[in-house]
């Protein structure tokens, strides 16, 4: 069993900074103001061949109301999940009433807890941590997480002995192999091999949309638990949360993202970070669920986000949420509006659901699997060339500069999204209308649904272009004799 280490403490004591250093990532958002982390975030850490799972949590300060209450609940859940707790305090700010309250709760849980005093760089650490002895948690470990000072000592003297106790050495290799395989699958860094089978990898599914359209509610409905903070206020989710799950004997990695709104309305520095994280999650995903609020309709920002998804080549499922409670007349108006504004995306399935009540949610994964299978299905060169030939016979390529464009053969150029490479003469001069015709013809012939398809064109090049003809010595002698003969004849 891989040990679980939770980082808890007041807001802005450096939990996310330490999380990023332990996991050697930038997965947790970090900035110099409180309340940045709202959901518990999991990361894999490895030190000297020992592995453990690290949980970053939102801060607890005892004055929570509204969404902050749910953040505190997430921190308490992380404590229950953990084998070891690192209780972080701010050495510069000194002992606070919230620190005392958290310490009291930790003592009642009887979890192995270690007190870590952060931000000790540039000050007398012994003097700065003196007040924290009153918490009664034993030894205090001073560190500077932003610079890494004291972190190695913390790992060697505190974490490693507990990791070895919870996870004996003989079990580490088996667990390490599992987590290495999982990490490669999630990060998408596996080397391509001839017998590659996309069904062996988890489907990375990103749930995106404008703020407060119900993304986290949908995530929790799918998972069957309050895994992500949900609150009726735009912008509750600020980070992208990666959650492994299994459904119908198929593995998934669910990515709940922050809402994306118009750039002019993004005034909060953290929200700018969150938008970047969301766009990165789209790039990282195999399939994207775009959630739209049925009551608000499709905004320009929805279309902008949709354009980014299509440009990224991600498979797409459109989810119209908050469908419950709408009258039949309003529903017809919404469907007409969808047909009008989304008519250019005829390959994506559209689902009408209520994430809050669960209606229609069960049908989403059939479309997700269909889109993923379409985007990763292997096609032979013979099949693609045959389809290309049929397309050119049904509708001949146009004339370019008085010559007919000739399509020679086609082959696969990549997957997720599927790419078809067509070779021929003057193919780069084809008009956009004929390129769209070819794309739609390939989509119908290959029965591709839920994913965009891309066509690339390559022209045959003259191998002797820009090369001067060089004569052999024998040819040079013949040339001299010929020139000499011509001169004599004159």
UniProtKB/Swiss-Prot annotation:
Against InterPro entries, the record matches this protein to: G_ENGA (IPR031166), GTP-bd (IPR006073), GTPase_Der (IPR016484), KH_dom-like (IPR032859), KH_dom-like_a/b (IPR015946), P-loop_NTPase (IPR027417), Small_GTP-bd (IPR005225)
The KH-like domain covers which part of the protein?
377-461
Q: Could you give the subunit structure recorded for this chain?
A: Associates with the 50S ribosomal subunit.
Keyword Nucleotide-binding, does the record have it? Answer: yes
Molecular functions (GO terms):
GTP binding; ribosome binding
Q: Cite the CDD domains for this sequence.
A: EngA1, EngA2
Q: Where does GTP 2 bind?
A: 209-216, 256-260, 321-324
The molecule here is called: GTPase Der
Signal peptide boundaries: none
Positions with a binding annotation for GTP 1: 9-16, 56-60, 118-121
Q: Which GO biological process annotations does it have? A: ribosome biogenesis
> Which function does this protein serve?
GTPase that plays an essential role in the late steps of ribosome biogenesis.
Transmembrane stretches in the record are none
Q: Which UniProt keywords apply?
A: GTP-binding, Nucleotide-binding, Repeat, Ribosome biogenesis
Q: Which Gene3D superfamilies match?
A: 3.30.300.20, P-loop containing nucleotide triphosphate hydrolases
Tell me the protein family, please: Belongs to the TRAFAC class TrmE-Era-EngA-EngB-Septin-like GTPase superfamily. EngA (Der) GTPase family.
């Amino acid at each position: 069993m891989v040990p679980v280490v939770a980082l808890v403490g007041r807001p802005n004591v450096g939990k996310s900074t330490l999380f990023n250093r332990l996991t050697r990532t930038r997965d947790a958002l970090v900035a110099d103001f409180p309340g940045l982390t709202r959901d518990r975030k999991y990361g894999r850490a490895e030190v000297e061949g020992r592995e453990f799972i690290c949980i970053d949590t939102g801060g607890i300060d005892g004055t929570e109301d509204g969404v902050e209450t749910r953040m505190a609940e997430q921190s308490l859940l992380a404590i229950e999940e953990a084998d070891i707790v690192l209780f972080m305090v701010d050495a510069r700010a000194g002992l606070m009433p919230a620190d005392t309250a958290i310490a009291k709760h930790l003592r009642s849980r009887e979890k192995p807890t270690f007190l870590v005093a952060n931000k000790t760089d540039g000050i007398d650490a012994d003097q700065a941590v003196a007040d924290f002895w009153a918490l009664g948690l034993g030894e205090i470990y001073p560190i500077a997480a932003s610079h890494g000072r004291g972190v190695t000592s913390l790992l060697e003297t505190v974490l490693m002995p507990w990791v070895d106790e919870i996870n004996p050495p003989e079990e580490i290799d088996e667990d390490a192999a599992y987590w290495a395989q999982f990490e490669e699958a999630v990060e998408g860094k596996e080397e391509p091999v001839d017998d590659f089978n996309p069904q062996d990898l988890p489907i990375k599914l990103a749930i995106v949309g404008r703020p407060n359209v119900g993304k986290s509610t949908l995530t929790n409905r799918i998972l069957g638990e309050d895994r992500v903070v949900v609150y009726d206020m735009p912008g509750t989710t600020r980070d992208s949360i990666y959650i492994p799950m299994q459904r119908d004997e198929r593995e998934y990695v669910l990515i709940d993202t922050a809402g994306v709104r118009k750039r002019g309305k993004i005034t909060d520095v953290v929200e700018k970070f969150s938008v970047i994280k969301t766009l990165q999650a789209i790039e990282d995903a195999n399939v994207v669920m775009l959630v739209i609020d049925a009551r608000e309709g499709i905004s320009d920002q929805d279309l902008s986000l949709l354009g980014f998804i299509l440009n990224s080549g991600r498979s797409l499922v459109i989810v119209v949420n908050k469908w419950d409670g709408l009258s039949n007349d309003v529903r017809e108006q919404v469907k007409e509006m969808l047909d009008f504004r989304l008519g250019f995306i005829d390959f994506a399935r559209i689902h009408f659901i209520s994430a809050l009540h669960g209606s229609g949610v069960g049908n989403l994964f059939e479309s997700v699997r269909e889109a993923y299978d379409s985007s990763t299905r292997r096609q032979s060169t013979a099949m693609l060339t045959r389809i290309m030939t049929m397309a050119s016979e049904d509708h001949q390529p146009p004339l370019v500069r008085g010559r007919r464009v000739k399509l020679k053969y086609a082959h696969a150029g990549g997957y997720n999204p599927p790419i078809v490479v067509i070779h021929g003469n003057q193919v780069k001069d084809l008009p956009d209308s004929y390129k769209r015709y070819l794309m739609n013809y390939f989509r119908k012939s290959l029965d591709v649904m839920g994913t965009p398809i891309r066509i690339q064109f390559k022209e045959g090049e003259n191998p002797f272009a820009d090369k001067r003809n060089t004569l052999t010595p024998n040819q040079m002698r013949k040339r001299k004799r010929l020139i000499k003969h011509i001169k004599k004849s004159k």
